[in-house]
Design a protein with these regions (language model features):
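Alpha-helix C-terminal capping segments
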Residues: 10-14, 59-68, 92, 118-119
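Short, ordered loop/turn segments at secondary-structure junctions
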Residues: 23-25, 52-53, 74-77, 103-104
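Glycine-rich phosphate/diphosphate-binding loop of Rossmann-like nucleotide-binding domains
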Residues: 1-30
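Glycine/charged-rich beta-loop-alpha catalytic/anionic-binding loops adjacent to active sites
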Residues: 14-19, 43-44, 67, 90-98
Length: 156
């Protein structure tokens, strides 16, 4: 939950309603099937599924829903430095697509979900545009600060 909370925070920041729960592809398979197969009916637009180790959850969720699924590989205590999770989510068979973000990158999963939703919701699209503008300004401020401390002799 510590990793996945970053996605929830992004969605809240963008004003997107969300549903946060815990399901397991291995320990609660019927709960996972019920959750994923009813998600569109409940009004969800995108599912973000985080998993560690064998990381079957995102793929299994994608197999029973028509919604876009974003997989977040999570480095767990028994993982192979997270590579098992990354590869499990990346290597999906044709017909069961899962968008995959970097290891523990739930924030990017939230941003990707917001961009998907923003393609059909002008309010969310505006918030995403502002988010990107804010990031641009932050980088420009850092560059200006560095340049003032370390002037570049090759600038024109």
């Amino acid at each position: 939950l510590n990793v996945m909370e970053a996605a929830a925070l992004v969605l809240q920041e963008m004003g997107i309603s969300l549903e946060l729960t815990v399901v397991s592809a291995h320990r609660t398979p019927q709960r996972m099937i019920n959750y994923a197969s009813s998600a569109a009916h409940r009004g969800l637009k995108v599912i973000i599924a985080g998993a560690g180790g064998a990381a079957h959850l995102p793929g299994m969720v994608a197999s029973v829903t028509t919604l876009p699924v974003i997989g977040v590989p999570i480095k767990s205590s028994n993982s192979i430095d997270g590579w098992d999770s990354v590869l499990s989510i990346l290597q999906m068979p044709n017909g069961v697509p899962v968008a995959t973000v970097a290891l523990n990158a739930a924030k990017n999963a939230g941003l990707l979900a917001a961009q998907i939703i923003g393609a059909f919701d002008a309010s969310v699209a505006e918030k995403m545009a502002q988010y990107k503008t804010d990031m641009k300004h932050a980088v420009e401020e850092k560059a200006a600060g560095m340049k003032s401390k370390w002037p570049n002799q090759f600038d024109m």
